[in-house]
UniProtKB/Swiss-Prot annotation:
Signal peptide: none annotated. The keyword RNA-binding applies. It comes from Tropheryma whipplei (strain TW08/27). Keywords: Cytoplasm, Magnesium, Metal-binding, Nucleotidyltransferase, RNA-binding, Transferase. The lineage of its organism: Bacteria, Bacillati, Actinomycetota, Actinomycetes, Micrococcales. This is Polyribonucleotide nucleotidyltransferase.
């Protein structure tokens, strides 16, 4: 067994120890590493590779899985079979965090299946394992001998009291303004020195950020602060990469060199380039003075079809073999990519004719779906998102059964991406990893501006339906959700908007140029060097996601991208606030929730034996009631009078009014006797309505039985006429 370890120094916040071991567990896998965080959090990562290339596969078949084991936290699964089932949302999000920096680090053309499995064997209370998992996956891949440009270091940072703290615990986040996860690797720059290439960033303002900023004077997570955080991460990433390299240096690695299958041959590329390059340059260079010109895209489709016909003829004539037909789409895309990038770098227009900082036409509308609690449509160019808000009692908040320290959340954001959004036919069913990731990004963008539980005691479910997609439906979801939440009457602390930025880099006349693009389309995302999504208020950033294909983004380029993103965000916020600038009245179909505080010792009395009391209140009023451990009672109903009636009944139980002579009550008949009826005035207080008084209710006529006038369960207005020495109550009917 070999091991390597290092220390992450957080100054006054203490240290964290990272340790990697190999050669003890999972020895059959091509690469396996056990990663430790402070000795108690333990992950096993294995990297395996298929012996043969996957047939009919034109992409790199990499699979990343995270297996959460309940025993890691000393739990038995709560499912019927007491066994782990499908991955939790948190595990899926961890898979995406690992996959995003790992995938581009393999050699292009690799077609052997590669599977990385990270198993959580042990986790200390209050710890997060995602950042450690990035390092574990990188280390197991590094020692597997596969062609890999790692190692990759991943670190989670929290901005606490102005300091970026690495690998924070859950309790640390209560004082944090921003939560940042960064992955990167060491590379040799043009000057021959080692530097850190940032590959992936995932970030969010925390739930308490608003209060920390506005009530405690904490630093706002604006563009400058985010840049500082990313720079701070580089120090920790270098340390993590050094630990992995030290481990690999202690091993006698047998490097595996699977065959590489390039997407196209040089001869196919040259032939296709000769067919289409000049025509594509005419189309895209011609967009320079044409403004927004989506017709350029259809023109390029015509060029592609003509070129395919010509290439097909060349195959039939024997110039290329039949298998070369599958290379045509990749070769065409490579030529198109080169033309489009060159046009942008040389100062010509983008693919659709826009300027570098232009946003596509915007449109927004609220209250578009009847009966729902809130709804809105947001459109940016061809990207269209429907947002729908549903409100309910807090007892409907999501309970999280995973290894994450977070056990529940009251704001739930779901994102759907049906195949018709891109004009295609496809599978419809449970959400894919991409949909889960997009929904979580939009959720994190909005959580910092949601009202507190005390100010707005509702569980909130937000659904984003991507109705049309051509670039950044996730940021469209943020905008649609802001509108929908306000339409539902949710008092957001501030509106939030999002925008996707892109980057194209390359040499022009020997000089390296970087050009940032605002509001990238789907094609620009595929052909560019960066996908950079930024969401926030007019004041600060609430969520950020960055993926890049470059070996590092210069600081001034990142700063420029953040500045352009802010300008675009403010422009979109202006459109949103023109549509709706304050919360609407809540829908008549939404529940009205009232909060009542009762003494903790009265909780059992309110619930009653086997829930008898609380169930009777719910049955009688139609309201829903939930009770918190601290004595907070939430009462909700879509009808205001039902809530008021339930509140009165709760108060009558926990804060009963002592009956006195002359006080009136709307009582309930609980028992009939030959001499009269017993009426319940308040819980535990009954009085007797004598038969002589009951006769007065029917003008004094003779009664064989009181059942002729009153029945059990009937409501009757009575007044206390006398209280005898034993405390017995005598009642009279009030007409």
């Amino acid at each position: 067994m070999q091991f390597s370890e290092g220390v992450i120094d957080n100054g006054r916040f203490g240290t964290r120890t990272i340790r990697f071991e190999t050669g003890r567990l999972a020895r059959q896998a091509q690469g396996s590493v056990v990663a430790y965080l402070d000795g108690e959090t333990m992950l096993l990562s294995s990297t395996s590779v298929g012996k043969q290339p996957k047939e009919d596969c034109d992409f790199f078949p990499l699979t990343v899985d995270v297996e959460e084991r309940s025993y890691a936290a000393g739990k038995i699964p709560g499912s019927y079979f007491r066994r782990e089932g499908r991955p939790s949302t948190e595990a899926i999000l961890a898979c995406r965090l690992i996959d995003r920096p790992l995938r581009p680090s393999f050699n292009a053309g690799l077609r052997n299946e590669v599977q990385v499995i990270v198993t959580v064997l042990s986790i200390a209370p209050g710890e997060f394992y995602e950042a450690l998992a990035i390092n574990a996956a990188s280390a197991s891949t590094l020692v597997s001998g596969l062609p890999f440009s790692g190692p990759i270091g991943g670190v989670r940072l929290a901005l606490i009291d102005g300091q970026w703290v690495a690998f924070p615990r859950y309790e640390d986040l209560s004082g944090a303004v921003f939560d940042l996860t960064v992955a990167g690797r060491v590379f040799v720059n043009e000057s021959g020195k080692e530097d850190i290439a940032i590959m992936m960033v995932e970030a969010e303002a925390t739930e308490p950020a608003w209060d920390l900023i506005h009530s405690h004077g904490a630093k706002k997570p604006n563009e400058e602060v985010i840049e500082e955080g990313i720079e701070s991460a580089k120090v920790f990433i270098r340390t993590l990469c050094d630990i992995q390299r030290d481990l690999a240096s202690k091993l006698s690695l047998s490097h595996t060199e699977p065959d590489l299958y390039p997407d196209y041959s040089d001869s196919v590329h040259s032939f296709v380039e000769g067919l289409v390059k000049s025509d594509l340059e005419k189309v895209y260079r011609g967009n320079h003075d044409s403004g927004y010109a989506p017709n350029a895209l259809s023109a390029s489709d015509e060029i592609k079809q003509k070129a395919y016909d010509a290439f097909h003829d060349a195959v039939l004539s024997g110039r290329f073999d039949q298998d070369s037909l599958s290379q045509f789409p990749h070769a065409y895309k490579a030529v198109l990519k080169d033309v489009v990038r060159t046009c942008v770098l040389e100062g010509f227009a983008r693919m659709d004719g826009r300027g570098l900082s232009d946003i596509r036409p915007l449109d927004a509308e609220v209250q578009v779906v009847p009966r729902v609690h809130g709804s809105a449509v947001f459109q940016r160019g061809e990207t269209q998102v429907l947002g729908v808000t549903t409100l309910n009692m807090l007892k409907m908040e999501q309970q999280i059964d995973s290894l994450a320290p977070i056990v529940s959340k009251r704001y739930i954001h779901h994102y759907n991406f049906p195949p018709y959004s891109t004009g295609e036919v496809g599978r419809v069913g449970s959400p894919k990893r991409r949909e889960i990731g997009h929904g979580f990004l939009a959720e994190r963008a909005l959580v910092p501006v949601l009202p507190s539980r005390e100010d707005f005691p509702y569980a909130i479910r937000q659904v984003s339906e991507a109705l049309g997609s051509n670039g950044s439906t996730s940021m469209g979801s943020v905008c649609a959700s802001t509108l929908s939440l306000l339409n539902a009457g949710v008092p957001l602390r501030a509106p939030v908007a999002g925008i996707a930025m892109g980057l194209i880099s390359g040499r022009v006349d020997g000089e390296m140029r970087y050009v940032t693009l605002t509001d990238i389309s789907g094609s620009e995302d595929a052909l560019g060097d960066m996908d950079f999504k930024v969401a926030g208020t007019s004041d600060f950033i609430t969520a950020l996601q960055l993926d890049t294909k470059l070996d590092g983004i210069p600081a001034h380029v990142l700063s420029e991208a953040l500045a352009h993103a802010r300008s675009a965000r403010l422009a979109i916020l202006d459109v949103l606030t023109r549509v709706i600038d304050s919360p609407d009245q809540m829908s008549e179909y939404a529940p009205r929730v009232v909060r009542v505080k009762i003494p903790v010792q009265k909780i059992g009395e309110l619930i009653g034996p086997k829930g008898k009391v609380i169930n009777s209140i719910q049955d009688e009023t139609g309201a829903e009631i939930s009770i918190e451990d601290d004595g907070t009672v939430y009462i909700g109903s879509s009808q205001a009078d039902s809530s008021e009636k339930a509140v009165a009944m709760v108060n009558s139980i926990v804060n009963p009014v002592e009956p006195c002579v002359g006080s009136q009550f709307l009582g309930t008949v609980v028992k009939n006797m030959p001499f009269g009826s017993f009426i319940s005035l308040v819980p535990g207080k009954d009085g007797l309505l004598h038969i002589s008084e009951i006769r007065k209710m029917v003008d004094g006529r003779h009664l064989e039985s009181v059942d002729e006038v009153l029945s059990v369960g009937q409501k009757v207005l009575v007044e206390v006429s006398k209280i005898d020495d034993r405390g017995k109550l005598c009642l009279v009917a009030v007409k």
